């Protein structure tokens, strides 16, 4: 089942450039996993980054985190931060929840029927 995580990274003083470099690396690693539907990263304030990640399945989430190319940059991102806040929308399985627990994830309710993957999604659609 699809789920989405929203992350807020509060970046340590003097670590923004390193953080952005590792963030760019992780976005490239994401492209190796078609089950990672979307990554969105923005910087709404100085020393703050917010991400939205959408995963098609629990397997795609775990494969993405298990990718050795991303493990170093992810660890560096965590080290560059004073605080990381993770919220999850959807219903990941027990194994994914165990991984997410390491990030102190909280689970949020979603309005009924409001978070689904379109079963006939077409990235080339003009409508």
Give names to the regions the model predicted.
Residues 1-2, 116-127:
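Basic/polar N-terminal segments that are highly enriched at the extreme N-terminus
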Residues 11-38, 69-73, 126-127:
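Short amphipathic alpha-helical segments
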Residues 28-37, 54-109:
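An amphipathic, aromatic/His-enriched active-site/gating alpha helix that lines ligand/cofactor pockets
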Residues 9-11, 55:
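Hydrophobic beta-strand positions in extracellular immunoglobulin-like domains
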Residues 50-51:
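Short hydrophobic/aromatic-rich beta-strand segments that constitute the beta-sheet cores
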Residues 3-9:
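Active-site-flanking beta-strand signature of metal-NTP-handling nucleotidyl enzymes
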């Amino acid at each position: 089942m699809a789920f989405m995580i929203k992350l807020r990274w509060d970046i340590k003083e003097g670590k923004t450039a390193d953080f952005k470099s590792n963030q760019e690396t992780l976005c490239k690693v994401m492209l190796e996993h078609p089950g990672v539907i979307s990554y969105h990263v923005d910087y709404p304030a100085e020393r703050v980054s917010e991400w939205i990640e959408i995963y098609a399945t629990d397997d795609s989430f775990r494969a993405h985190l298990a990718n050795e190319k991303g493990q170093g940059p992810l660890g560096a991102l965590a080290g560059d931060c004073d605080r990381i806040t993770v919220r999850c929308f959807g219903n990941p399985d027990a194994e994914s929840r165990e991984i997410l627990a390491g990030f102190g994830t909280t689970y949020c309710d979603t309005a009924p029927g409001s978070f689904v993957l379109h079963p006939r999604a077409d990235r080339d659609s003009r409508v």
